[in-house]
């Protein structure tokens, strides 16, 4: 990854942190690249058999560090709950990251039985018992850093976050194609090391349980998937009355809005803060029938630990009038009455209907679907459960050619589908679709040129997707991985009224790609700038000022715009 010999020496030093804590830091530089590792060295099992879950949840818990052989750190440190939060927040403030990766703070509930052995899971959940508190400490530190920076600097720090599922990967279909899996395996092999490596470190040369071919041979298959806890596409693009591209996203755990500097300029201005945080990187946006923008987000309503509540809630921000100011954020709660179940609620998905209603959908703690509807008069109805089971997060909500609501989700067995039978009617679970088993990433869906609903997704471990509508068709050249977005657009040939399906996603190297059409001769187009988004890119396709726009967020927390032309070369 650094372009250096795997045994290149690291520069070791001591870092002094809040609370009198000291940590070891290792630095490696190679040309324009550099890496810094900070080892807090909190013991997995501290004095008295104390583990990090107790440091999160039990007041008064203290854990000691474990000094590594040969470490420049001379004395162990002690961590209480707030000490660890202060240390993490201090590290963030010192180094000002633009992208923070975390573990899953709210893992799925998991039944453990003969068919689903517990293995390395914590009781009742699909992740390791240490992963969850580490993620919670990180998110609490993020919130503290943002609050302190905002008070000091009058603005929130600019960064984005990505949270990864953990042992969840064992429980669901694998979603990485062979080429991407091979890249991941090479990195993990280097991390795992081997006892016979001559690395010059008396403490050892890797996490040997992850070395060699062990991860690929492990029946649990953790390596064979990469699932996001918040699998939405951000930023979410739309347009304003002047024809400028507008994008909504989450930056520094706060909602923000970017506007294009001028119609068609291809550049966003500075972000405008909309507040609402601390928010997960999960945002859904719709424009209601009156032209007002409505934003939905998932908020960390409480990150207390130490025996206090950890709460999540869906929140909404609504414009007073088209292109006008926003009202205050409003909490919509969750469909769950128990806070522990509320933590497992998924990312919001929404769709606006011509009758003035706005339909909000979320995945529930029991892996089904729930909805809440804003009526045309602006009043929100109660949460309602719509049934279903064993779906993954990453819902797709859209209207069909008749204006009826559809919701689609990747299930363990097939695609799960809810829909209206008539305009204004309830959204209800449909009979099993019988479609091939999805790999688990969010599904692409659009009204096809023939007026039917077309679904686009990859099956487990597949490199190319298929389009499922009246018939099924493999999209043979659209090689990649992850979520796919779809939209029907004007055909590049320019023939009057001719339409085709447009796809956007990531190629096998993670770069954004689009493809006009799904036939055997259609080829993907890639951006001249080799744009690589954090998470999934978003697609806007309209018949007005914008045409086709792809929007994404770079690792430096800067949004970009790509307006692909059908003549671009792959």
Residue ranges and their predicted role:
Residues 42, 166, 388:
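Active-site donor-binding loop signature of nucleotide-sugar glycosyltransferases
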Residues 1-39:
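Glycine-rich phosphate-binding loop and adjoining beta1-alpha1-beta2 segment
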Residues 9-20, 64-233:
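Metal-dependent de-N-acetylase/amidase catalytic core
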């Amino acid at each position: 990854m650094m372009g250096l010999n795997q045994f290149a020496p690291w520069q070791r030093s001591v870092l002094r942190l809040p609370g009198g804590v000291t940590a070891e830091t290792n630095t490696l530089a190679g040309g324009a690249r550099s890496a810094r590792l900070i080892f807090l060295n909190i013991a997995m099992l501290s004095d008295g058999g104390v583990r990090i879950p107790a440091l999160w949840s039990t007041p008064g818990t203290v854990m000691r560090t474990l000094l590594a052989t040969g470490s420049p750190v001379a004395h162990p440190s002690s961590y209480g709950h707030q000490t660890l939060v202060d240390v993490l927040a201090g590290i963030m403030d010192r180094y000002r990251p633009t992208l923070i990766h975390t573990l899953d703070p709210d893992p799925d509930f998991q039944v453990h039985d003969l068919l689903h052995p517990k293995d390395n899971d914590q009781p009742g959940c699909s992740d390791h018992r240490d992963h969850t508190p580490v993620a919670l400490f990180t998110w609490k530190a993020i919130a503290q850093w943002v609050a302190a920076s905002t008070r000091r600097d009058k603005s929130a720090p600019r960064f984005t976050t990505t949270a990864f599922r953990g042992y969840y990967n064992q429980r669901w279909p694998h979603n990485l194609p062979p080429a991407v899996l091979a890249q991941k395996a090479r990195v993990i092999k280097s991390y795992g090391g081997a006892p016979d490596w001559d690395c010059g470190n008396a403490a050892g040369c890797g996490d040997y349980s992850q070395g060699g071919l062990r991860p690929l041979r492990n029946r649990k298959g953790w390596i064979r998937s990469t699932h996001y806890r918040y699998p939405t596409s951000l930023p979410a693009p739309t347009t304003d009355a002047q024809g400028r591209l507008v994008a909504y996203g989450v930056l520094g755990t706060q909602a923000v809005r970017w506007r294009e500097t001028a119609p068609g300029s291809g550049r966003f201005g500075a972000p405008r803060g909309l507040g609402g945080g601390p928010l997960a990187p999960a945002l859904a946006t719709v424009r209601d029938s009156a032209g007002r923008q409505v934003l939905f987000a998932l908020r960390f309503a409480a990150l207390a630990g130490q025996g206090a509540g950890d709460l999540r809630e869906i929140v909404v921000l609504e414009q007073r009038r088209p292109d006008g100011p926003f009202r205050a954020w409003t909490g919509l709660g969750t469909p769950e009455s128990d806070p522990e179940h509320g933590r497992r609620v998924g990312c919001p998905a929404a769709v606006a209907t011509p009758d003035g209603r706005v339909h909000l959908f979320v995945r529930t703690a029991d892996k089904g679907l729930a909805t809440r509807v804003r009526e045309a008069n602006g009043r929100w109805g109660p949460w309602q459960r719509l049934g279903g089971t064993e779906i993954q997060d990453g819902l797709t909500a859209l209207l069909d050619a008749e204006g009826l609501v559809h919701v689609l989700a990747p299930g363990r067995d097939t695609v799960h589908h809810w829909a209206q039978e008539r305009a204004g009617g309830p959204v209800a679970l449909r009979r099993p679709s019988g479609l091939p088993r999805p790999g688990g990433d969010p599904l692409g869906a659009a009204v096809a040129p023939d007026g039917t609903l077309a679904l686009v997704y990859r099956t487990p471990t597949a490199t190319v997707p298929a389009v499922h509508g009246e018939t099924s068709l493999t999209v043979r050249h659209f090689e990649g991985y992850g979520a796919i977005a779809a939209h029907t657009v004007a055909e590049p040939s320019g023939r009057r009224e001719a339409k085709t399906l447009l796809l956007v996603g990531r190629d096998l190297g993670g770069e954004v790609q689009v493809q006009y059409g799904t036939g055997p001769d259609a080829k993907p187009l890639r951006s001249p700038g080799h744009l690589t988004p954090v998470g999934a890119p978003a697609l806007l396709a309209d018949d007005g000022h914008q045409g086709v726009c792809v929007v994404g967020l770079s690792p430096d927390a800067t949004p970009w715009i790509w307006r692909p032309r059908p003549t671009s070369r792959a």
